[in-house]
Amino acid sequence: IKFDLIMIKQTLHFFNKEKRTKLIKICKSNLRKNGVLVIFSLNTINNEIPCFKLMKQKLNRGLERDSRMIKFTCNMLKDNTIDKFKFKVLITKSKYIKMLKQKYISCLVNLNKKQINKGIKEIKDIYNKNIIFEDILICIKYKHI
């Protein structure tokens, strides 16, 4: 089976370099002529995601790794294009705290309950009732010719 579109959304960073390489090669080989591979990732610079101190440290470490991953991916996918999608986000502090408790972003996965609760206290102290920020996704687009 060949596909017209294959989309990978914010998951490549879960794989090691070898498995990422294999996945991208499999995706490329399973595209029809003029098929498109689209890979979404968080913007790696000037990220505005609301963070508590430990979360920011983990997020920045992950974004540095993601930056290297994106460069490597672009080298594998010759003649790619990169777009950025900007989303204005307005979320209540209480809703965001619920998301933190659910570990909505991968940099929170390895934090324990005590660390999350300490971070939530920081968020409560830092942010207003409504949290407004810009979320930016990078989109790498490769067309199989």
Question: Language-model segments: which ranges?
Answer:
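Short conserved loop adjoining the S-adenosyl-L-methionine
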Residues: I1-K2
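Conserved class I S-adenosyl-L-methionine
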Residues: V36-D66
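A conserved beta-strand element that flanks and buttresses the S-adenosyl-L-methionine
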Residues: M7
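Short N-terminal helix/helix-N-cap motif within the alpha/beta-hydrolase-1
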Residues: N16-R20
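Conserved Class I S-adenosyl-L-methionine
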Residues: N80-I145
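A short glycine-rich, Lys/Arg-flanked "PGG" loop and its adjoining helix->strand segment in the class I
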Residues: T21-V36
